């Protein structure tokens, strides 16, 4: 793998992980569209570790408080957040352990990915209209709904950030609250997935290109988080809806022409 390819894949991972456009769809489609070979599990793990570092650094103050309060005063409203986030991770974790390999095999078709991009873009658009319409809080019910929605992101094209933001918007959270919940909920699931796969890392695969991709994913991951958190303060999610639909249409046309 060249350094250019590594940087490109790192950039795609960073954008797709934190923007509601589906990193898995882009990483699956790039080899198909551009003729790039699959870079292997070691590189996938490196990219996920990079995005984990990005979200931990950006929300370092929040996570410090969440963990401290969760361990020292778990019965308070502040202390419950840690355990709610853990609870919200369970549905996706269970589905990932049981069905990830099957899902990645069955749903890697370009047509399926395109359909997921388009269908869930429309759902995001509908949810966006409900942003901030209710006085809602993070509790067992809301976090389980968002957590169950997160499990759908195992299918390429759905988007983990997209589906969790969509679920939060449908519940009545504001756009900024929905994005923050999505990012906080992503931390344990990304960490868990990376830790489970660490044993599969082949040190012989690690080279300068891998490091370049890792740094790209970490740096741009942080930048994309910052961008989205600022963007949703004044804008809706329509730009991502349009992008997803356009990409889905392009994929379908390209697949039919091949």
UniProtKB/Swiss-Prot annotation:
Compartments annotated for it: namely: Cell membrane
Give an example GO cellular component term for this record.
plasma membrane
* Topology within the bilayer: Multi-pass membrane protein
The protein's annotated catalytic reaction(s) are: di-trans,octa-cis-undecaprenyl diphosphate + H2O = di-trans,octa-cis-undecaprenyl phosphate + phosphate + H(+)
Name the family.
Belongs to the UppP family.
Keywords of the record: Antibiotic resistance, Cell membrane, Cell shape, Cell wall biogenesis/degradation, Hydrolase, Membrane, Peptidoglycan synthesis, Transmembrane, Transmembrane helix
One Gene Ontology molecular-function label = undecaprenyl-diphosphatase activity
Gene transcribed to yield this protein = uppP
InterPro entries with a match to the protein in the record: UppP
UniProt keyword Magnesium present: no
Q: Which residues cross the membrane?
A: 14-34, 39-59, 79-99, 106-126, 136-156, 176-196, 209-229, 237-257
One Gene Ontology BP term is: response to antibiotic
* E.C. numbers: 3.6.1.27
Q: What protein name does the entry list?
A: Undecaprenyl-diphosphatase
* UniProt miscellaneous comment: Bacitracin is thought to be involved in the inhibition of peptidoglycan synthesis by sequestering undecaprenyl diphosphate, thereby reducing the pool of lipid carrier available.
Q: Which Pfam families match?
A: BacA
Role description: Catalyzes the dephosphorylation of undecaprenyl diphosphate (UPP). Confers resistance to bacitracin.
The organism encoding this protein is Elusimicrobium minutum (strain Pei191)
Looking at its record, which EC class is this enzyme? Answer: hydrolase
């Amino acid at each position: 793998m060249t350094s250019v390819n590594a940087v490109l894949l790192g950039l795609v991972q960073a954008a797709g992980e934190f923007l509601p456009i589906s990193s898995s769809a882009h990483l699956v489609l790039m080899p198909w569209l551009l003729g790039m070979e699959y870079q292997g599990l070691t590189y996938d793990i490196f990219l996920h570790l990079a995005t984990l570092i990005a979200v931990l650094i950006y929300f370092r103050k929040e996570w410090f408080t969440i963990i401290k309060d969760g361990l020292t005063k778990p019965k308070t409203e502040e202390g419950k957040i840690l355990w709610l986030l853990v609870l919200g991770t369970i549905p996706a974790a269970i589905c990932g352990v049981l069905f990830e390999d099957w899902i990645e095999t069955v749903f890697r078709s370009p047509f399926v990915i395109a359909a997921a991009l388009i269908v869930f873009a429309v759902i995001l658009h509908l949810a966006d209209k409900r942003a901030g319409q209710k006085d809602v809080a993070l509790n067992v019910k809301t976090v389980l709904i968002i957590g169950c929605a997160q499990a759908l992101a195992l299918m390429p094209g759905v988007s983990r950030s997209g589906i969790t933001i969509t679920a939060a918007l449908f519940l009545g959270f504001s756009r900024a609250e929905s994005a923050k919940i999505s990012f906080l909920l992503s931390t344990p699931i990304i960490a868990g997935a990376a830790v489970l796969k660490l044993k599969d890392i082949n040190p012989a695969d690690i080279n300068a290109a891998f490091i370049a991709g890792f740094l790209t994913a970490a740096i741009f991951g942080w930048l994309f988080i910052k961008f989205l958190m600022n963007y949703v303060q004044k804008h809706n999610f329509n730009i991502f809806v349009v992008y997803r639909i356009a990409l889905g249409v392009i994929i379908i046309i390209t697949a039919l022409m091949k």
